[in-house]
Amino acid sequence: METTATILHADLDAFYASVEQLLDPSLRGKPIAVGGGVVLAASYEARAFGVRGGMPGRKARELCPQLIFVGGNFSHYQRLGDAAIKVLDDFTPVVERISIDEAFADVAGCTHLFGQPRDIATAIRHRVRAELGLPISIGVARTKHLAKIASQVAKPDGLVVVDPGTELDFLHDLPVSLMWGVGPATKSRLAEIGIQTIGELARTHSGALTRLLGPAAGEKLAALAWNRDPRKLETRRRAHSAGAQSALGQKPAVARVIVPTLLHLADRVASRLRAKARPGRTVTVRVRFADLSAVTRSITLDQPISATTMLAEIAGDLVRGVLADHPREKTISLLAISVSHLEESAELQLDLPLGLADEKRRPGSKKGLARFGADRAIDKIRERFGKQAVGYGTVALEAARSVPDEFRELAEKEL
């Protein structure tokens, strides 16, 4: 680990809402939400009333009757997000962009040019505000995890530097919800055994965390609670997974909602896998319920897949398993699919026709090859005539369209 804090995490504050207030100054100081049927993003003024991203529009209006909904200016989001990252690039070549509105930067190699990390972070914030008119919060620390937490503590529109020697004092008084990987469901499970702060988590025996969260998550959180994070910045990341999600508002957990939504998600994910000739072996689904708690489930296959209907069916099995384990949950607010363990191969290994029950889900079987061929035909039509030229009937007729496709594409774009 470095002996000085040189890793920055820069995060544009309430980015989509801030852009809307920049484009229309009459919205400044007012509670606004980007979206309609589902809140895609909320300004800090709206968050003060409890409005959050992913929330149904109706509930958001109940919490904040004066809430102003705006449709979204997606080209401006991309332009301004790129411009903010360019400011970081002007100070250091070691930049890892992790989303449209946030990035890590390591300034260890440029302090002789621009001053100490605190000075560099201050200069970045001033330039983003002066050149783009947007607020940005920055955290500075020795590790990526701590820098990201520091930027959250700095919000809105602030700067927090965590110097070596003060790290655990800073970290251990903070709530566990600030940690990477702790969502509402994990936070709730930790609270059940009396863990509210990162310090309480750090002092919990690793065996208890493993039993509660599983070996991977338990060991990871235990290490992060002690600021043990050896990860380096990845400036030229190659995608290790592909995913898509759909915020549904509040929908009944029934087949007529789940099946078309999963097919729509599978279409978005699988088409990207085929375009990169990178099928994957591990399929993961995420189901978020009405109370915003979420459950994930995954399966690792014998062969990598990139066929749309095959992915949708496997995801459907996983989602049904989640719902079977949570029979009291009758409403879902989000579904997500991701494929990981990607491989560098466009070719399919042929299977012998053994009449196996899962033959249609085996990529190299006769039925599997037919499915892949149909997908490639769809890909070629879309390449020539556009994405809307052809699709799956179930998706076209039934899939919820509460989130604009432009927003989905922006969120899923490989940066």
UniProtKB/Swiss-Prot annotation:
Residues 7-183 form the UmuC domain. The lineage of its organism: Bacteria, Pseudomonadati, Pseudomonadota, Alphaproteobacteria, Hyphomicrobiales. It is found in: Cytoplasm. The active site is at E102. This is DNA polymerase IV 2. Transmembrane segments: none annotated. Belongs to the DNA polymerase type-Y family. Binds 2 magnesium ions per subunit.
